[in-house]
Design a protein with these regions (language model features):
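Short, well-ordered beta-strand elements within core beta-sheets of diverse protein domains
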Residues: 241-251, 299-307, 363-367
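Conserved PLP-enzyme active-site core in the AAT-like
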Residues: 2, 71-272, 277, 288
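N-terminal glycine-rich, Lys/His-bearing helix-loop that initiates the first secondary-structure elements
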Residues: 1-46
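Positively charged, small/polar-rich N-terminal and surface patches that mediate targeting and assembly
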Residues: 2-8, 14, 275, 330, ...
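Glycine-rich phosphate/pyrophosphate-binding loop
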Residues: 29-30, 38-58, 62, 335-360
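PLP-dependent enzyme catalytic core of the Aspartate aminotransferase-like
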Residues: 110, 119-121, 137, 307, ...
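Conserved small-domain helix->loop->beta segment predominantly found in fold-type I
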Residues: 261-321, 325-330, 347-353
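Conserved N-terminal alpha-helix of the aminotransferase class I/II PLP-enzyme fold
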Residues: 34-83, 87-88, 104-111
Length: 383
């Protein structure tokens, strides 16, 4: 598909090919574990569903298209996709990673891959000098989230990619919070893009999935081998759901962005709110970088109350009626979350506080309901 097409057209048609036998416009769900061969080793390109599945292949093509990449790979979850990238490394290798990343990524790094001899150095990647200062001869990977979860810090993808190339490091960007509608890290020089497709790509809170997109064929072959060998693949039903979700990504993201701007502005003027973390504010520390590399600022944000007690935060978290108290994000419905006890509970409190993630921080995934109803819900919950 041509990269000159507008985003909506690209998302609707990504990975879509009419079924040759029936003409079905939607990719069929190939619910099979194996494929018949006419003779040993003689087949139609499909041997076993862990290695090949037509529904998954269509989705992987779509992933590549929407991220302006050449190769896409689908995984059973975002964490599985992250794990695959880590398996490119060998004992003794080092990783420079964002210090305020998603708690699940931190858990994977600190509790699984550190035991395998990988060293992780956590820095504030929003300042490229911090990354440069952390790189050694053993550094093989730079792991970036932008915007970060949940503090919405912004990292200059282009600047970090230049650093990575200079030091022969893979640069992998977790693009989950932005989605391909708002940001395409490969265009900024990144080596790999990772998504938890559970979030905005699926968009309906009904599937768990992850993906990787890259341009380098040799790297794709390595990651495909890992995908196949570890078996971290999604089933065809899940692939179908994400394929369907991608078709409406652009219209959903437009509403997420519109609602996000309204909610952020409301919270900022609320007398009981101390601070709002949203990268669309012109006084956000790296707003100029966000404006340069993003098409909009999305519906993810966090805030703290002037009463910074956990009890005050819990009162808000337990009082919403439209916002559902739940982990995850990026669905059509609005979600409210307490990172300290939910998504980031695996990070030691001292480290979490040092990174700026307060006990009373509240994270919002602003959905696509009517903005007036979303704001009214926050108003009654905050009081």
């Amino acid at each position: 598909m041509s990269n000159t097409q507008h985003l909506g057209t690209k998302f609707i048609h990504a990975g879509a090919h009419p079924d040759p036998s029936t003409g079905a416009i939607m990719t069929p769900i190939y619910q099979t574990s194996t494929y018949v061969q006419s003779a040993p080793g003689v087949h139609q390109g499909y041997e076993y569903a862990r290695s090949q599945n037509p529904t998954r292949f269509a989705l992987e093509e779509a992933f590549a298209v929407i991220e302006n990449g050449k190769f896409g790979l689908a995984f059973a979850s975002g964490v599985a996709a992250t794990d695959a990238v880590m398996r490119l490394l060998v004992p003794g290798d080092e990783v420079v990673a964002a210090h305020d990343m998603y708690g699940g990524s931190f858990r994977l790094f600190s509790k699984v891959h550190e035991k395998m001899g990988i060293k992780f150095i956590y820095v504030d990647t929003s300042n490229p000098d911090n990354v440069i200062g952390a790189i050694t001869a053993k550094t093989k990977l730079i792991w970036v989230e932008t915007p970060t979860n949940p503090l919405m810090n912004i990292t200059d993808i282009e600047a970090i990619s230049v650093i990575g190339k200079k030091h022969n490091c893979i640069v992998c960007v977790d693009n989950t919070f932005a989605s391909p509608y708002l940001q395409n890290p490969l265009d900024q020089g990144a080596t790999i893009v990772m998504h938890s497709a559970t979030k905005y790509l699926g968009g309906h809170s009904d599937v768990i999935q992850g993906c990787l997109v890259m341009n380098d064929e040799a790297l794709r072959d390595q990651l495909y081998f890992i995908q196949k060998s570890t078996g971290a693949v999604p089933g065809p039903q899940d692939c179908f759901l994400v394929l369907r979700g991608i078709k409406t990504l652009h219209v959903r993201m437009q509403r997420h962005c519109e609602n996000g701007e309204k909610v952020a502005a409301y919270l900022r003027q609320h007398p009981k709110v101390a601070r709002v973390y949203w990268c669309g504010f012109t006084d956000h520390p790296n707003h100029d970088i966000a404006e340069k590399q993003m098409r909009g600022f999305g519906g993810m944000m966090s805030f703290t109350l002037k009463d910074d007690s956990i009890a005050a935060a819990i009162k808000v978290l337990s009082s919403t009626k439209i916002f559902s108290l739940a982990e995850s994000l990026g669905g059509v419905e609005s979600l409210i979350n307490h990172p300290a006890s939910m998504t980031h509970a695996s990070i030691p409190r001292e480290q979490r506080i040092a990174n700026g993630l307060a006990d009373g921080l509240i994270r919002l995934s602003v959905g696509i309901e009517d903005a007036e109803d979303i704001i009214a819900d926050l108003a009654q919950a905050i009081g």
